[in-house]
Structures are given as C-alpha cells and as structure tokens.
Design a protein with these regions (language model features):
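Outer-membrane beta-barrel signature, preferentially recognizing the C-terminal barrel domain
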Residues: 1-4, 98, 158-202
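Transmembrane beta-barrel wall of Gram-negative outer-membrane proteins
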Residues: 1-19, 60-66
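Residues on the lipid-exposed face of transmembrane beta-strands in outer-membrane beta-barrel proteins
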Residues: 2-6, 52-58, 105-111, 139-143, ...
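Transmembrane beta-strands of outer-membrane beta-barrel pores
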Residues: 8, 19-25, 72-78, 101-103, ...
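Outer-membrane beta-barrel transmembrane domain signature of Gram-negative proteins
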Residues: 19-23, 28, 32-120
Length: 202
C-alpha cells in the first residue's frame, strides 16, 4: 500500500493505492471405508484486487465539517473445482475467470450546534460493473452526556444496499448467478463510555 497525506489548518487530503491478493481453498471429502477419503470437492480461488482511494476534509469554523471520499477497486478472480464429475463419469475442471470494476463515492456533512451535540448526514452511491446502486443516505447523532467517562448517547438510521460479490455469484461450489442485490434499512442506538486514567491506561 502506498499512501499520501497533505494537512493544512482547516483542511486535509489523503490518497492511497495498493494491491491485495487472497487465496482460498475448499475441500470436501467423504469416507468411503477403511479410512479412505474420496474427495468430492477440490476448489481453489485466486483473488487479485488493485485499488486507489482518496478522501478530503474541510472545516468551516468549529461547527461544520465536510468530508468526501472515493474508492475504486478492480477485481480479478479465478476459481477452479477439479473434482466435478461429468455425466460420462469423467472428472473435469469447472470454474470461472471474471473481472469487475467497483466504484464508491460519498459525501458527509457534520454539524455541531453545541459543544456536546453532533449531527451528520452522509450520501453514498456505488457502481459495480455496469450497474449503479440507488442513492444511499444515512443520518447520525451523538450527544456527550458527561465529560467524565466520556459518556455519549449515539443513534443512527441508514439505508443499506448490498450487491453480490464475484464469489457470491460464481464460486464453486455454492455460487449462485441468480442472486440479486439486497436492500433495507438499519437503526442503531446506544451508550458509549471510556474508563481509565489519562496517560496510564484505558
């Protein structure tokens, strides 16, 4: 991963670029007797990802903070299952080799009308392949109940949208090319606090 940061008094920008490699193995064997295992599944998955991301923050006084972020990923995935048995009872290799571009962009505005209260709104949109998600909004609120112990009340409501990954669609075994995106809403609320002694433990 390569990263770059640039800071000023009331704004900052940052960028990252990198490469991620993942390898998965899935084996399934059946005991056919006498301690002998017959492998029914012998699946291997190679996942290569190139990515770049950038983000920026801009403060207006002490009450407003605006942030923007964009992420671009290029995925290359290869999957093989060498234990598939065809109708003529011969083993054959089944799998897939696909690539997909994914883009995510978001903007956030945070307002602190008082020292204790913070309110923020986020708008996000994503692209996967040639498809675009609907606009995904989220709202967050937090209130500092007590400075002692940093006791905060937090709440949020957001729209959720999840599209299938390449492995969700094509992984052998278990991939399902008929999967469709999932959507919904989530609501959260709670209290957070911190214990410890500054400079000693937390």
């Amino acid at each position: 991963v390569l990263s770059w940061d640039h800071l000023r008094r009331n704004w900052k920008v940052a960028a990252k670029a990198g490469y991620i490699y993942s390898w998965f193995a899935y084996d399934y064997a059946n005991d056919v007797g006498n301690g002998k295992l017959e492998y029914m599944t012998n699946s291997r998955n190679w996942y290569h990802t190139l990515f770049v991301s950038g983000e920026g923050e801009y403060y207006i006084g002490r009450k407003w903070l605006f942030t923007a972020q964009a992420d671009l990923h290029q995925h290359f995935v290869t999957n093989n299952d060498r234990r598939i048995i065809s109708q003529d009872m011969n083993r054959k290799t089944v799998g897939y080799d696909h690539a997909r571009t994914e883009l995510s962009a978001s903007i956030t505005a945070k307002w602190m009308p008082t020292e204790r209260l913070g309110l923020s709104v986020t708008l996000r949109e994503e692209m996967y392949g040639a498809q675009w998600t609907p606009l995904i909004p989220a709202f967050y609120a937090d209130y500092l109940i007590s400075k002692r112990g940093t006791i905060r009340a937090k709440a949020s409501v957001s729209r959720n949208y999840r599209y299938p990954t390449l492995n969700d669609l094509y992984f052998q075994p278990g991939g399902n090319t008929d999967l469709v995106p999932e959507s919904g809403f989530s609501y959260d609320g709670g209290i957070s606090f911190a214990i410890g002694k500054e400079g000693v433990y937390s």
